[in-house]
């Protein structure tokens, strides 16, 4: 999704986060750790995935401010990276993952809120983003990623109810 303003970006994030939280509220802890939501991943694993991508985006920004270009994964590297993320977090408890996800979401919001509209939307404003606007690196890890997660969770819930 292309955003024309910081306000629209923040509103989309707030809306999708609330929708995700509402969807999660209907699940029991047992359901949230059951595999099979997205391949072998559980809802907990999806939240760990979202958290890790938040942390990577925060790192990219912080590294970029030092004048260094962060190692942002190429499309061909995403699948192996996601497998590593799963392996890294699979043994964490649901409580740990929920807490980490909520914390990283807040940190992303704080970063976005700290940026002016010009900083957020102007291509090349930050040298590390080259010709892109910084929103290009932040937006895929927020509302659109939440929509991706909700799509998998909803499909899984339908399958679960059908059984």
Model-inferred region functions:
Residues 33-80, 120-163:
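Short, contiguous alpha-helical
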Residues 2-6, 87-91, 131-135:
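A short, mixed-charge helix-start or loop-turn motif at secondary-structure junctions
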Residues 28-31:
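Active-site flanking loop/helix segments enriched in acidic
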Residues 81-121:
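Acidic/histidine-rich alpha-helical segments that form the ligand environment
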Residues 17-25, 54-62, 102-116, 147-150, ...:
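Structural signal for well-ordered, non-membrane alpha-helices
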Residues 10-13, 97-101, 139-142, 146:
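Hydrophobic packing residues in well-ordered alpha-helices of helical domains and bundles
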Residues 1-19:
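Extreme N-terminal tail/first-helix region
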